[in-house]
């Protein structure tokens, strides 16, 4: 774990080398502003003042030419390579009400809803805690990057996570789920 210091504030947070600065900060309960978590919106911009990060998507559409000239980065697309000091806006309204956590979930069921849409049910060993409108990020076998899917059920103590997912041609995430790369009984990281 690396220590990420937010310049001008008393806050710092631990961040794993295989996690983005955004997810590390949210897991620590900090109000880091974001919208998409995928590099498209630019809401999670920061300045790297000290240390090094790995930029996972240097040509992300969330950064303007001006941002690139000023060496701004996106917290959702940068992983720490050591301890860092960053300058980033903190928004108390963005403080997570439920802290995001990594967990292994097991695919227990897949059922066809329409010709191109299925419901996938995953189960975790802990309860399923989330708010309406939130989404989960999946690491799927054979897929580069994370895939975001919105939950189709409600928080529950049973640990059930339901997703209604459309089969998108040419999408590796759809392929992994619809073509059986992820089979019932298999665990994936969420």
Predicted regions located by residue number:
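Iron-sulfur (Fe-S) cluster-binding segments and ferredoxin-like electron-carrier domains
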Residues: 20, 24-33, 43-92
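N-terminal pre-ligand scaffold of iron-sulfur
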Residues: 1-32
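Ferredoxin-reductase
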Residues: 99-186
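Residue-level "contact hotspot" at macromolecular interaction interfaces
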Residues: 14, 35, 79, 129, ...
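Short acidic, glycine-rich loop/turn motifs
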Residues: 5-8, 48, 140-142
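Short, conserved secondary-structure segments in the cores of folded domains
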Residues: 11, 32, 37, 126, ...
